[in-house]
């Protein structure tokens, strides 16, 4: 039996990391996963050794070494290709489940809507990077830009988070459009972490793609 691939998407500060941890505790005993399946937690960028090196260059580059938008796009694609081939596909082939913090939707939102790079070009590149892999379920943690910025005041920003409000507004709009186009499961992320987790549990328990077959 092929495994299942679940993805959390959303703007910075939406609570993906917190929800990833809570899902990691709940999913193995939820009754959704088949007996003997393992849950693999991962993230983009940085889900492989190569990805971790790329993540550091992308988010915390040395002085005067920040990538241009086109180089940034290619680096994210390289991270994803390695991630898919070396980690995600092998796990799915064994019948395991994979839960990832971000996938290809983030590239369309950040590099497409945020940076203004050509959407058709990104989609062509994504076909190579993903090898045609599509998540079984994408959970979109829907948080307003204002709430996102308020939450991020309490932490140190990386290079992408520090791009400014106009950039992040375009990214937020991009996520909203993608969620509508691709049938993502929208989760209101302004709720408490416990309430968000409960909403995610209900969504997954009722999702047709996760029924055993």
From Swiss-Prot:
Entry-linked Pfam families: Thymidylate_kin
EC number(s) per entry: 2.7.4.9
Which Gene3D superfamilies does this one have?
P-loop containing nucleotide triphosphate hydrolases
Q: Which InterPro entries match?
A: P-loop_NTPase, Thymidylate_kin-like_dom, Thymidylate_kin_CS, Thymidylate_kinase
UniProt keyword Kinase present? yes
The Gene Ontology biological process annotation of the record reads: dTDP biosynthetic process; dTTP biosynthetic process; dUDP biosynthetic process
NCBIfam families listed in its UniProt record = DTMP_kinase (TIGR00041)
Q: What does this protein do?
A: Phosphorylation of dTMP to form dTDP in both de novo and salvage pathways of dTTP synthesis.
**UniProt family annotation:** Belongs to the thymidylate kinase family.
Record-given protein name: Thymidylate kinase
Tell me the organism. Synechococcus sp. (strain WH7803)
